[in-house]
Regions:
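Surface-exposed polar/charged interaction patches
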Residues: 92, 125-128, 155
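Phosphate-handling catalytic cores of nucleic-acid transaction enzymes
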Residues: 152-164
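Short amphipathic alpha-helical coiled-coil/interface segments
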Residues: 138-149
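A charged, amphipathic interaction segment
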Residues: 99-136
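Noncatalytic partner-interaction/assembly domains of nucleic-acid and motor enzyme complexes
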Residues: 1-111, 164
Length: 164
């Protein structure tokens, strides 16, 4: 599977260190669960969203508490409790100011995973389905790829505005 675990961790680590709730909310609005290949990262992302929606601060302590409340803490590996995992996320970004760049890397890998998924599905449909089914799957996959490319283009525009 195509993934960017270091960029995922760096992005989440930046959000754990962002002091302005509006900044965190803005970045959370730009990502989807499917952008993250690591289910632990998805759990942290979900905890962050829950906290922001409740008007609570997002930091390692509040996120760990939310993971516990939601019962997701068990998702963390046996040798790495949620607190240790979150500490690793805090240490992941070389520069908190590069959060937008980490997000771009995550989104680029999302597009690549979408292409990979579509390619596998189209291969399967080509080998074993009717042409009508193949056309439907092709259209659906094309629409999803266009959506993902659109998200990437929107982020590229935002990135250009942030660097100026």
């Amino acid at each position: 599977m195509i993934a960017a675990p270091a960029a995922e961790a760096a992005f989440l680590g930046c959000l754990l260190q962002t002091r302005a709730a509006t900044g965190t909310r803005g970045y959370l609005a730009q990502v989807e669960d499917g952008d993250f290949a690591d289910p632990r990262h998805v759990a942290v992302l979900t905890a962050m969203r829950t906290l922001v929606e409740a008007g609570s601060p997002v930091d390692p302590i509040t996120v760990e508490g939310q993971l516990r409340r939601s019962g997701v803490e068990a998702l963390m590996t046996a040798d790495k409790r949620a607190a240790v995992f979150l500490a690793d996320l805090l240490a992941a970004p070389p520069s908190v100011g590069s959060v937008g760049h980490y997000l771009m890397i995550v989104l680029e890998h999302t597009v690549r995973r979408s292409i990979e998924t579509a390619a596998v599905r189209l291969q399967q449909v080509a080998e074993s389905s009717s042409l009508d089914d193949a056309r439907d799957v092709t259209r659906t996959d094309y629409q999803e790829l266009e959506r993902q490319f659109g998200r990437l283009a929107a982020r590229e525009c935002a990135e250009g505005g942030e660097s100026q």
